[in-house]
Design a protein with these regions (language model features):
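Exported/periplasmic ABC-transporter solute-binding proteins
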Residues: 1-42, 47-60, 66-89, 95-239
Length: 239
């Protein structure tokens, strides 16, 4: 996994969204060692990241879900030929630590868990959009509408679940839930979404047209998408 080289040392900025943060942070540290460049990593909710990239903020590499990257390409906000797949993330369900955990092996069990939940907490980004649509597809949108709470990102979602009554359910990206559990947040992972209704989100990186150090940014984007990077992402729950 070669980072490339440059005569001038640059400070590169990665602005990203989603559960690839841990893997990206580890890879950024590796890129710094190999290239001599400095890399700052900032992650936020996908809608906010999209707004900033579309507004031509001075970002070198943007990392967002596939649909957002498609929009960046359509609007000419990323450099052609620099887009690369970081990995794919799946969704899961969490409750407050110590709360009872329902067995959710299939779609019917998921549907019942949603009907039984005192609150269904999800983000305002793609994960939350998917859950709201899924509840409608399952025919329980009306029954659950008043109990759905949308928050800016998965961290806020799971912090709310940790401080909520035991019957609240949080839904988000598995990798992010697992990271928060490891950090000691008072939540417990119940299960991934059942296979029949699982939602897989692909995360892509690309150099933005606003980057002021295109050569170094291209080297960083290649480093993040290199075959050797897959093992780093896999270790954080991204495949």
């Amino acid at each position: 996994m070669s980072a490339g080289s440059a005569e001038t040392v640059s400070t590169l900025k990665i602005l990203g969204a989603g559960p690839v943060k841990r893997g990206v942070s580890r890879l950024a540290a590796g890129f710094e060692k190999q290239s001599g460049h400095r890399v700052t990593v900032e992650f936020a909710g996908a809608p906010g990241v999209s707004e900033r990239v579309l507004a031509d903020e001075a970002v070198d590499v943007a990392i967002v879900p596939q649909a957002a990257m498609d929009e960046f390409e359509k609007r000419g906000k990323v450099v052609a030929g620099t887009r690369g797949l970081m990995g794919r993330s799946r969704m899961g369900i969490a409750v407050r630590k110590g709360a009872s955990r329902a067995d959710i092996p299939d779609t019917e069990a998921f549907k019942q868990a949603m009907l039984d939940a005192g609150a269904i907490v999800c983000n305002v980004a793609s994960s939350g959009v998917y859950i709201v649509k899924l509840l409608d597809q399952l025919g329980i949108a009306d029954a659950t509408r008043d109990r759905i709470l949308r928050l800016p990102d998965t961290v806020k979602v799971m912090e709310h679940v940790a401080g909520s009554p035991a019957h609240a359910i949080g839904v988000g990206q598995l990798a992010e839930i697992s990271e928060l559990v490891e950090k000691g947040l008072g939540i417990a992972l119940v299960a991934p979404l059942p296979d029949a209704i699982q939602n897989v989100t692909a995360y892509h990186a690309a150099v933005t047209v606003a980057s002021r150090q295109q050569d170094a940014a291209r080297a960083l984007a290649r480093f993040l998408a290199a075959p050797e990077a897959k093992a780093v992402f896999a270790a954080t729950g991204i495949d």
